[in-house]
UniProtKB/Swiss-Prot annotation:
Binds 1 zinc ion per homodimer. ATP binds at residues 12, 32-38, 137. The keyword DNA repair applies. One of its GO terms (molecular function) is ATP binding. Pfam families: AAA_23 (PF13476). The two conserved Cys that bind zinc constitute the zinc-hook, which separates the large intramolecular coiled coil regions. The 2 Cys residues coordinate one molecule of zinc with the help of the 2 Cys residues of the zinc-hook of another Rad50 molecule, thereby forming a V-shaped homodimer. Residues 404-506 form the Zinc-hook domain. Zn(2+) binds at residues 454, 457. The lineage of its organism: Archaea, Methanobacteriati, Methanobacteriota, Stenosarchaea group, Halobacteria. This is DNA double-strand break repair Rad50 ATPase. Residues 198-451, 477-506, 564-594, 688-721 form a coiled coil.
Amino acid sequence: MRFTRIAIRNFKPYEDAELDLRDGVTVIHGVNGSGKSSLLEACFFALYGSKALAGTLEDVVTTGADDAEITLEFVHDGGEYRIDRRVRVSGDRATTAKCVLDGPEGTVEGARDVRRHVASLLRMDAEAFVNCAYVQQGEVNKLINATPSQRQDMIDDLLQLGKLETYRERAGNARLGVEDVLTKKRSVLEDVESQIEAKEDADLHATLNALESELDSLDEEISNYESQRDKAKSALDAAEATLDEHAEKRERLDEIESAIEDLTAKISADETKRDDLSERVRELDAAADELESDIDDALARADLDDASDEAIADAREALSARESELRDDLSEARTRAQAFETQAERLRERADDLESRAEEKREAAEVDAETAAEAERELESFRETRAELRSALDDAEARFEDAPVELGEAADLLEERREARSEARESLAETETELKNARERLAEAERLRDAGKCPECGQPVEGSPHVDAISEREAAVESLEADRESLESAVESRSAAVEAAEALVEVETRASSRRDRLDLVDERIADREETVESRREAAEEKREAAAELDSEAEEKREAATTQAERAEEVAETVDSLESDLDTLDDRRDRLDRVESLVDTRAEKIDARDRLREKRETLAEVNRERREHLRERRERRDELRETVDEEAVEGAKQRKKNAAAYLERVEDEVLPELREKRDDLQSRVGGVEAELEQLDDLRERRDHLAERVDALESVHDEVSTLESTYGDLRAELRQRNVEVLERMLNETFDLVYANDAYSRIRLDGEYGLTVFQKDGTALEPEQLSGGERALFNLSLRCAIYRLLAEGIDGAAPLPPLILDEPTVFLDGGHVSRLVDLVEDMQSRGVKQILIVSHDEDLVGAADDLVRVEKNPTTNRSTVERTDAPIVEGALADD
């Protein structure tokens, strides 16, 4: 894997930066704090998002910006990839607004999905990336300072041996699960076998035979009673049939008599209706004659010769033609009148609009004039403020003429003096502590002397004062008191110097603030001068425009008056045409009257004819009804002769006897017998169910036995798998330890050839031991700071080589990234680091990125990148440059 391009906007100190990254060794060079590490952090953040941050998302967005954008392009395993991320700040919270990964496999969107895809591509998450390829600033001793177990976890994760441990744990969990299931199945099997034994002891087959024999006898008795019941039902049915037949004949007789009465009533009612219809026919004849007279009068008023349909249609056609002609003229006249009125209204509205616009122009001119006057007053005020600020700045510059530093350097002076005061205070505190201890020792010596004991050893002495030790301690106390007084004087002097520096910083701060205010006042003066001129010109232009609009409005009002007069003339023509149309409507109403009377007369005649037909129909219906009445009276007489009352009484007695027998058998005898049979059947069913349960239990026992055998086999297989994973992990770890130890010593020999150290031992638990030339074993913590740094870099490079050569033959690892690796190194050790970088490059590492402010690394670079920060804007910039240019720039610095 190789980075090819990084582009960032509003990322930490960068406002807008873009850098192409090439193969070989790239040194990113610049002074401390210029933003070099932020370039590498941008690459790391593009790959892993928030997991690559020590803080929060808000930390990556440039202060004062609303969002940040990062684009990283890289090649991996022959494919080209591009990641775009955008972080947006809303309020106090930052979120990922966009995260897209484009590659040969397609597009992946979303921060989590992109992070998972990157981890899958590189076969390492953010933590593994840092442990393998990215030596972050300040973390150069991370692997050395880690415990062996921590180091083991880091390296195992990188080599993916952690997966074997995960598989072993899964197999162990599976083994425990199988043991739980096996225990449960064995318990169930024992329970089933005890149930089978209990049922076999109950002799269920003999019990079933006895119950079935008793049940057959009871079924025979029930069958006999049911046969007698069926015979009684037959007798009951025959008696009921006789009674039903008699009832049916009686019902039919009643129906016929009812039908005779209905027919007689209907014949009488229809005869009454025929008389009423004859009266209504006579009334309709009289009404038709009266309508004939009304039609003659209407014809005379309508100026028609006859009331035929042709005459009425001709008259209507003539009226329609005249009406069409009048309406065309009326429509044309109305259109003209409306057009004149619309034109007049539009002209009046246009005049009103022009007058309104003229008034607005005049008001706007007044506003512009007032704005110009106000801006002129503000202009005078700003000029006075500028003079005051300029005077204050001159005073501040005069204050620094006698100061030990220039204006703008007071903060550095204050920091130096504060550090000096802190050092003096620390020395004073140490001296006071030593003085306190010396006084305590002197007091103890005097106490021992007074007690007749040696001040040195505390043993009793005889006659010897032994004052030498006491004199020395008194001299020490006096010396420390003198030192304390000197240090107190130094602290007081340095505190006064700090106060003086603080006063200068305050003056400098006020001067900076006034300089900013002066720039702002200059901008406002220029703005107000422009406002005065532009507003006065605008006011004059608007007054001229208002006069032109008033003149145009007067012309529009005169034109509106002319069009209104034309509209009134056309309106008179409209009134005349509407009067002619009203006359035509009167003639049409008279025609409608004639036509209505003719239609009414025709309706009366039609109604009369329908009533006559209905009267004849009723006469025919009554003739048919009288024939039906004669037939029903004959049928009634025949039915009266067929009814036998004695047969009916005999049938009633037989029905009563049969019903009494059926009631006793069905309500008492058969229910009791059936209840006994149901009880026996239930008992038989219970025994049969127990026999079926016995068969089921035997089948279940066989199945459980097979299941237990299978689980025992699975348990053995899972146990074997668990131990296999553990053995394989231990074997692979030992092989990796041996290879890693060899590679580590190869790298260490390169770094420390011909020096005091001979080799490094890496044990199976990843414990590290360094051996000197004389065979003395040392812990890594016993090395110097620079030696530990090179030792750690050697270990990092060895791990990188192991990953590159040991996973599937050759793994496309990310670039080797070193962020400020020289922080713990002196000049001699830096040259060893250069040798190490060249060795890694010679071993096939295609891309190495180094961030450093050290000039010694420039010579090892294939590609040089310079990072600078503008002290005014606090923004960083990046550019690629050639080595001679960089070295010259460094010399200038």
